Swiss-Prot record:
Keyword terms: Cytoplasm, Ribosome biogenesis
InterPro entries given in the database record: Ribosome_maturation_RimP, RimP_N, RimP_N_sf
Subcellular location: Cytoplasm
Family label: Belongs to the RimP family.
Lineage start: Bacteria, Pseudomonadati, Chlorobiota, Chlorobiia, Chlorobiales
Predominant location category: cytoplasm
GO cellular component: cytosol
Tree of life domain: Bacteria
Region Disordered: start-end pairs: 143-176
General function of this protein: Required for maturation of 30S ribosomal subunits.
GO biological-process terms attached to the record: ribosomal small subunit assembly; translation
Protein name, entry field: Ribosome maturation factor RimP
TM spans (from-to): none
Amino acid sequence: MQGSIDSHIEGIVQNILEDSVGTKGEGVYLVAMTVKGSAVHRKIEVILDADSGVRIDQCSFFARRIRERLEEDEALSGTMGEDFDLVVGSPGLGEPLVLRRQYGRHVGRLLRVWYRDTEGVEHEVAGHLQAVSLTEGGGSITLKPQTAKKKGRQEETEDMTLELDAVSRAVPEAEI
């Protein structure tokens, strides 16, 4: 039953996002959604993003729309309970990138990436994201790896290109 509730709520969220064309919510997409708790008290977390980033006013815009639809939905009335928490936000710094589409807005930023080489050995690299190439079946990213500074100057490194299929995790990091 929980799985069908999750997919029903996700369908509602997707419909709201699709209906937002031409409004302040245009261009926003669903990254992740979780539903926790029992029928007595549920917590719904919705993580949204956009190619240019999501603003706070967009999160509140969608929170209102989602809450209205959930409260009006007769299919959920018996299974949701009257008391539920709804949290709508955007991915924070340090949160892993979940969708390929998210890489584009991090060009120029520091990224820590875990990837597997051709032998299947996992490696970790931190560097500035230089480019993103998304294709129908995959894509790649180009990083300029960070190196340790030696006596006041930073050593030059060559850019490295990684196929997105080889990337197991990528996390934007703060620059210090």
